[in-house]
Amino acid sequence: MKISALALLATISINGQVYAQDSQIQPPPHQPEQASAKMPECVILLHGLARTSKSMLPLSEQLRAQHYLVVNVDYPSRKFPIATLAEKAITPALENCRQYPISGINFVTHSLGGILVRHYLSLQKIPELKRVIMLAPPNKGSQVVDNLKNLPPFGWLNGPAGKELGTESTSVPNTLGAVDFDLGVIAGTSSVNLLLSLYLPNPDDGKVSVENTKIDGMRDFISLPASHPYIMKDDAAITQIIHYLHHGQFLHAPATVDNKEL
């Protein structure tokens, strides 16, 4: 399959947008006065490749309204390999959570952020860990990376971590194995990048196929009509995230037969 060089330049970033980044951790707010006396849980937000914490702000605001302490992380996703990024992003975020009296630590991630969590937890435990929710994670890699990673613009836009997200058996996601923590995965089924969708098995979100978001050991899975670059801002996705944090499962539509609920 061939795509013009001009089109590639417009679409090649695995997350669709490119931002200047710096490694800055935003500390969580104090617990609101109206919240219950029970110690709150901390939620660490990890954005995707070539994004910043700004992409997670709508979600952050909704979680704060639910009385979670939120650490919305900025990390230099285009500068380092996944192993380095996992340490740079997650260790300071945990330190921020632990400054406060909390009853547990959760993660909500977008795209690459989920692979950072998998890598970190493959090497060390987080004693306070409760739940992890991944939005559009390339848990089995992406065929977009397979096809485009050797083109110079891809490396410039996505950095070394982007090149590690292929579907080959030696890619970082595929060497991490099954998960052994409480994980819910939300996949998108809508694409705003039809050129990149040509590389992907349907259904897909324009960057990752629905099938490749799944991982052995996950506790629950749901797909939504959202696209890869915007799924973290999707109202239905945010509702599902909050429900999973509260209950450990997603809101699934009840099965029906002849319009009658089972």
Predicted regions and their residues:
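Flexible, membrane-associating and regulatory peripheral segments of lipid-active enzymes
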Residues: 2-46, 50-73, 86-87, 93-100, ...
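Short secondary-structure boundary micro-motifs
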Residues: 27, 32-33, 45-46, 91, ...
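Helical cap/lid subdomain of alpha/beta-hydrolase-fold lipid enzymes
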Residues: 40, 122-262
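Serine-dependent carboxylesterase/thioesterase catalytic core
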Residues: 41-54, 58, 64-76, 82-180
